[in-house]
């Protein structure tokens, strides 16, 4: 029998599909990536072709094994992590989608959400699903498809149509239509799932007129769901053994599996999650309550806060303001000055996310004087990412009663040493940057490997987790609070800008 040497993680993201091969020491052996088309039928609408998602993901699986010269019988298991909330409806018989995937960014269901608010359902939705009423989540997207594709609701009631988030769609295709499942983390992002009862919520299904017959079975994040023989040189059937939504996968990849541990992912935006253990903490400060992965893939809970503009604000400096030619240059220019010269940049280009939730806020630069130059503005833009992270962390600490001792970080912007040091300074806590940057894929790999015994337990994984660099606060509390109070003043003045009644 061939030794099972590797784990494969499939990382299905918003703009690309990736496959990563990892060995027993959690080293990356091979990576393959394919981008796919973003479809914008109308302003504010975002779609993907589900067949293109499948084609890009399945081809990366074949490609990543070929690149590493690995046969499928050397793979112990496959783990899947995915863009969350994106909704797909397809025919059970043919596997053919009845409409394009409606992507998490799509705002077309704003009117449905406004009706839910008028119907007085905000408290029910927050109390039972942990979410706010927003087009972001899957439920209203499924309703929209059933409302607009003729005859689809009746077909769904007859069991002819199936709904799934991207993980469910991939597993359906990988198992040739034999397995229709999701995991608790993805289910918790649909606005259809009761996070306390751990079952689909009948009231929400009734309100949105979504037949239960079309919903997947909900399972743990770490167990064998089915097998696939797609990809590789051999015909061996490989267990599919781990599923988690991308942010929960990153939390697990960072081994934040104990109550009070938190990670922040610095991408286009920022996603911060804090594990709250077996207790679902209701937020009074504009955060989401969501399901995370416990030590062996069982249900834990987390608080989540999203910052809309992180890396995107650096792209703005590069593409629109032309102050830098490459995102990596931002650190160089920021360190050419000793501070921001009193400048604050509030990058509220699309409003403000947690904990403010102000869609009418707009971007602004405050504190301009004659002595301010482009380096000050670049530095202030970088600092805004750290300030927004503190906003979210303060909300988390207020909700949970937990004082954070260290923040684990991942995502593209963590390579910026200036930003990471300033993040530590403004939080007053350690910032830990891991050696392995592929923590989302790592989380999916860990979940799959634990399910099949490739790794025995978390203690074994902890030994493999190497912190590449630790950043510690380098400013006094008085200075920290003075700078942060300036940020709070700037945010207050940027809020409600587009709301002409205020």
UniProtKB/Swiss-Prot annotation:
Cystine bridges: none
Entry binding sites for ADP: 14, 18, 268, 311, 412, 416
Binding site residues for ATP: 14-16, 268, 311, 315, 412
A Gene Ontology term for the protein's cellular component: cytosol
Enzyme class: transferase
Activity control, per UniProt: Activity of this regulatory enzyme is affected by several metabolites. Allosterically and non-competitively inhibited by fructose 1,6-bisphosphate (FBP) and unphosphorylated phosphocarrier protein EIIA-Glc (III-Glc), an integral component of the bacterial phosphotransferase (PTS) system.
GO MF, any single term: metal ion binding
CDD domains on file: FGGY_EcGK_like
Keywords: Allosteric enzyme, ATP-binding, Glycerol metabolism, Kinase, Metal-binding, Nucleotide-binding, Transferase, Zinc
EC number: 2.7.1.30
Alphabetized InterPro entries for the sequence: ATPase_NBD (IPR043129), Carb_kinase_FGGY (IPR000577), Carb_kinase_FGGY_CS (IPR018483), FGGY_C (IPR018485), FGGY_N (IPR018484), Glycerol_kin (IPR005999)
Signal peptide: none
A Pfam family matched in the record: FGGY_C
Catalysed reactions listed for this entry: glycerol + ATP = sn-glycerol 3-phosphate + ADP + H(+)
Family statement drawn from the similarity comment of this UniProt entry: Belongs to the FGGY kinase family.
Oligomeric form and interacting partners: Homotetramer and homodimer (in equilibrium). Heterodimer with EIIA-Glc. Binds 1 zinc ion per glycerol kinase EIIA-Glc dimer. The zinc ion is important for dimerization.
Protein purpose: Key enzyme in the regulation of glycerol uptake and metabolism. Catalyzes the phosphorylation of glycerol to yield sn-glycerol 3-phosphate.
Name of this protein: Glycerol kinase
């Amino acid at each position: 029998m061939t030794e099972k040497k590797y784990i494969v993680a499939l990382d299905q993201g918003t703009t690309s599909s990736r496959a990563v091969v990892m060995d027993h020491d959690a080293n990356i052996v091979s990576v393959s990536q394919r981008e796919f088309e973003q479809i914008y039928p109308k302003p504010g609408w975002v779609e993907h072709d589900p067949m293109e998602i499948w084609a890009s993901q399945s081809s990366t699986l074949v490609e990543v094994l070929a690149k590493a010269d690995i046969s499928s019988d050397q793979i112990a298991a496959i783990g899947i992590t995915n863009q969350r909330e994106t909704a797909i409806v397809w025919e059970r018989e043919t596997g053919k989608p009845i409409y394009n995937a409606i992507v998490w960014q799509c705002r077309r269901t704003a009117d449905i959400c406004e009706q839910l608010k008028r119907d007085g359902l905000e408290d029910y939705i927050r109390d039972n699903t942990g979410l706010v009423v927003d087009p972001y989540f899957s439920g209203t997207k499924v309703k929209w498809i059933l409302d607009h594709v003729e005859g689809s609701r009746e077909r769904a009631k007859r069991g002819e149509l199936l709904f799934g988030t991207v993980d469910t769609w991939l597993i359906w295709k990988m198992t040739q239509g034999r397995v229709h499942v999701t995991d608790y983390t993805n289910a918790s992002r649909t606005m259809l799932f009761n996070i306390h009862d751990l079952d689909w919520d009948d009231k929400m299904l009734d309100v949105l007129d979504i037949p239960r017959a079309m919903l997947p079975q909900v399972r743990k994040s770490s167990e064998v769901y089915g097998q696939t023989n797609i990809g590789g040189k051999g015909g061996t059937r490989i267990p599919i053994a781990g599923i988690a939504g991308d942010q929960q996968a990153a939390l697990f990849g960072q081994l934040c599996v104990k109550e009070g541990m938190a990670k922040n992912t610095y991408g286009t935006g920022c996603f911060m999650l804090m594990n709250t253990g077996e207790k679902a903490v209701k937020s009074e400060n504009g955060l989401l309550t969501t399901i995370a992965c416990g030590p062996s893939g069982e249900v834990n809970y987390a608080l989540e806060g999203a910052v809309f503009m992180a890396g995107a604000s650096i792209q703005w400096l590069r593409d629109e303001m032309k102050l830098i030619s490459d995102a990596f240059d931002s650190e160089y220019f920021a360190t050419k000055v000793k501070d921001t010269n009193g400048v604050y940049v509030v990058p509220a280009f699309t409003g403000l996310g947690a904990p403010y939730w102000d869609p009418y806020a707009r971007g602004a630069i405050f504190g301009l004087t004659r002595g301010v130059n482009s380096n000050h503005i670049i530095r202030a833009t970088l600092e805004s990412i750290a300030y927004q992270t503190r906003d979210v962390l303060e909300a988390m600490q207020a909700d949970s009663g937990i004082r954070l001792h260290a923040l684990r970080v991942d995502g593209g912007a963590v390579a910026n040493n200036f930003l990471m040091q300033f993040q530590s300074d403004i939080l007053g806590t350690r910032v830990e940057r891991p050696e392995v940057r592929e923590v989302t894929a790592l989380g999916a790999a860990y979940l799959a490997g634990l399910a099949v015994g490739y790794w025995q337990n978390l203690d074994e994984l902890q030994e493999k987790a190497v912190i590449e660099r630790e950043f510690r606060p380098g400013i006094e509390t008085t200075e920290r609070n003075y700078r942060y109070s300036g940020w709070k003043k700037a945010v207050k003045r940027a809020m409600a800008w587009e709301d002409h009644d205020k």
